[in-house]
Amino acid sequence: MELQVVGANALTVSETTFGREFNEALIHQVVVAYAAGARQGSRAQKTRAEVSGSGKKPWRQKGTGRARSGDIKSPIWRSGGVTFAAKPQDHSQKVNKKMYRGAIKSILSELVRQDRLVVVEKFEIDAPKTKVLVQKLKDMALTDALIITASLDENLFLAARNLYKVDVRDVQAIDPVSLIAFDKVVVTVDAVKQIEEMFA
């Protein structure tokens, strides 16, 4: 199959990477697993056993007229412990390499079908200036875009750093979440070739 390149001849690419069927279930599973792996999982609350304080019975069992109480660290008391206290945990999910690659290829194929993949000969700017990058994107009628290059361009990276709807990645740093998060994905010819090699 061929991909149209802006201002250049069409690029012949592999059908297995850019022409796969859309597998929604696989993409969903991989995206959920990727997001789960990004969770910090460090929250921690104290049970009644871990709260600092005296173990003395606050008042005698009978005769005061108050409700019976045996511990100031009881979960029903203010400043007491938490009944089912949250503890640090690892939320990561196992995803087989074959599944991950399949999801990436399925996403790339769907981007092609929806005309959301924009292939360019090269994508560079002369200086690390946000204004320059904004103008370049404006000339291409783009406002919300992920830019993928073969190797990380420092000028592009610095210029895009404070643009909310623009991100710059090299091929090694692409992931399923970033690929589906933007309206358009701008990718250079060299990056397309690298992607084919990586996910062949």
From Swiss-Prot:
Source organism superkingdom: Bacteria
Chain residue ranges for the region called Disordered: 43-71
GO MF terms held by the record: rRNA binding; structural constituent of ribosome
GO cellular component: ribonucleoprotein complex; ribosome
Biological processes annotated in GO: translation
Record's keyword terms, sorted: Ribonucleoprotein, Ribosomal protein, RNA-binding, rRNA-binding
Alphabetized InterPro entries for the sequence: Ribosomal_uL4, Ribosomal_uL4-like, Ribosomal_uL4_dom_sf
Subunit annotation: Part of the 50S ribosomal subunit.
Function summary: One of the primary rRNA binding proteins, this protein initially binds near the 5'-end of the 23S rRNA. It is important during the early stages of 50S assembly. It makes multiple contacts with different domains of the 23S rRNA in the assembled 50S subunit and ribosome. Forms part of the polypeptide exit tunnel.
Family membership: Belongs to the universal ribosomal protein uL4 family.
Stored PANTHER family: 50S RIBOSOMAL PROTEIN L4 (PTHR10746), LARGE RIBOSOMAL SUBUNIT PROTEIN UL4M (PTHR10746:SF6)
Name of the protein in its database record: Large ribosomal subunit protein uL4
Gene designation: rplD
